[in-house]
């Protein structure tokens, strides 16, 4: 069987994996020249088209993402605790500083007080040694007041009063023969209370008065007076009290007394019958 010569022989390709060519990449298939001589005037067939370029190699795999630090939350908590401790220490130091400042201030005041006391004591000692006595202390004004209570053995007029025992009081005022003697001019509140009682009521008129004696007046001057009538039921046991009190402008050497109409009916208990005054 003969093959027509107007057709070229099929081309044969060979691959040499060990040979390398500067014009072809490794593994390129090269055509093998045919051993059949070509005819005169026959065109050489065009070379085969170059093979398509190989795809680029795949990119290398990405490195694994770093894991988040496990102790980040713990570090935040630790930092917060340290900040709180810092503020606590700062507050403690500030308090300690304030306390030390107050202590220093108190010590300074105490030292100044001791120094002033020492200076006063030294000055007083020097005055005593030199012979200059210190000024006498100021005397407080004596309060003018008197409170006298009934005297059971009183048998005459004016009434006599207890001025020594019991709840009596005398200050800045003198007591003389049943009367209070004023030694300083001024406003005084004068008061007197007399307690009357009896086994059988006779409704005798009763009077109770406070009067004043002074050499400037020719006779006694009645200051206060109380009268009682129809104060009990006839034939029955009874008791009645009379109280007098008012403000007067008294002068020195005035003498005040108390008089009653029925001395035998007076109860002289200190809580029931009394006489007194005090300066306003």
Curated annotation (Swiss-Prot):
Pfam families: TNF. The chain crosses the membrane at residues 81-101. The record marks 80-81, 128-129 as: Cleavage. InterPro entries: FASL (IPR028326), TNF (IPR006053), TNF_CS (IPR021184), TNF_dom (IPR006052), Tumour_necrosis_fac-like_dom (IPR008983). Residues 20-70, 117-155 are annotated as: Disordered. It is a single-pass type II membrane protein. Residues 102-280 are extracellular. One of its GO terms (cellular component) is nucleus. The keyword Ligase does not apply. Residues 144-280 form the THD domain. It comes from the Eukaryota. The soluble form derives from the membrane form by proteolytic processing. The membrane-bound form undergoes two successive intramembrane proteolytic cleavages. The first one is processed by ADAM10 producing an N-terminal fragment, which lacks the receptor-binding extracellular domain. This ADAM10-processed FasL (FasL APL) remnant form is still membrane anchored and further processed by SPPL2A that liberates the FasL intracellular domain (FasL ICD). FasL shedding by ADAM10 is a prerequisite for subsequent intramembrane cleavage by SPPL2A in T-cells. Phosphorylated by FGR on tyrosine residues; this is required for ubiquitination and subsequent internalization. Its main location: membrane. Keywords: Apoptosis, Cell membrane, Cytokine, Cytoplasmic vesicle, Disulfide bond, Glycoprotein, Lysosome, Membrane, Nucleus, Repressor, Secreted, Signal-anchor, Transcription, Transcription regulation, Transmembrane, Transmembrane helix, Ubl conjugation. The keyword RNA-binding does not apply. Residues 43-69 have a biased composition (Pro residues). Cytokine that binds to TNFRSF6/FAS, a receptor that transduces the apoptotic signal into cells. Involved in cytotoxic T-cell-mediated apoptosis, natural killer cell-mediated apoptosis and in T-cell development. Initiates fratricidal/suicidal activation-induced cell death (AICD) in antigen-activated T-cells contributing to the termination of immune responses. TNFRSF6/FAS-mediated apoptosis has also a role in the induction of peripheral tolerance. Binds to TNFRSF6B/DcR3, a decoy receptor that blocks apoptosis. PANTHER family: TUMOR NECROSIS FACTOR FAMILY MEMBER (PTHR11471), TUMOR NECROSIS FACTOR LIGAND SUPERFAMILY MEMBER 6 (PTHR11471:SF33). Belongs to the tumor necrosis factor family. This is Tumor necrosis factor ligand superfamily member 6. The lineage of its organism: Eukaryota, Metazoa, Chordata, Craniata, Vertebrata.
């Amino acid at each position: 069987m003969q093959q027509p010569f107007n057709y070229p022989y099929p081309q044969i390709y060979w691959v040499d994996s060990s040979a390398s060519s500067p014009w072809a990449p490794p593994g390129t298939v090269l055509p093998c020249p045919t051993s059949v001589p070509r005819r005169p005037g026959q065109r050489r067939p065009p070379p085969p088209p170059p093979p398509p370029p190989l795809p680029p190699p795949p990119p290398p795999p990405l490195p694994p993402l770093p894991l988040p630090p496990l102790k980040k939350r713990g570090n935040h908590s630790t930092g917060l605790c340290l900040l709180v401790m810092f503020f606590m220490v700062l507050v403690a130091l500030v308090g300690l500083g304030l306390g030390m400042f107050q202590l220093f201030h108190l010590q300074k005041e105490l030292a100044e007080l001791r120094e002033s006391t020492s200076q006063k004591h030294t000055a007083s000692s020097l005055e005593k040694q030199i012979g200059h006595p210190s000024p006498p202390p100021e005397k407080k004004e004596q309060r003018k007041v008197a409170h006298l209570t009934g005297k059971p053995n009183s048998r005459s007029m004016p009434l006599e009063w207890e001025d020594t025992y019991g709840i009596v009081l005398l200050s800045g005022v003198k007591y003389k023969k049943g009367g209070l003697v004023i030694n300083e001019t001024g406003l005084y509140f004068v008061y007197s209370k007399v307690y009357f009682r009896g086994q059988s009521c006779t409704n005798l008129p009763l009077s109770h008065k406070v009067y004043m004696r002074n050499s400037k007046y020719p006779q006694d001057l009645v200051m206060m007076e109380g009268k009682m009538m129809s104060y009990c039921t006839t034939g029955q046991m009874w008791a009645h009290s009379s109280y007098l009190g008012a403000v007067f402008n008294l002068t020195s050497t005035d003498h005040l007394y108390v008089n009653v109409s029925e001395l035998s009916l007076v109860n002289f208990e200190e809580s029931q019958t009394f006489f007194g005054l005090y300066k306003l």
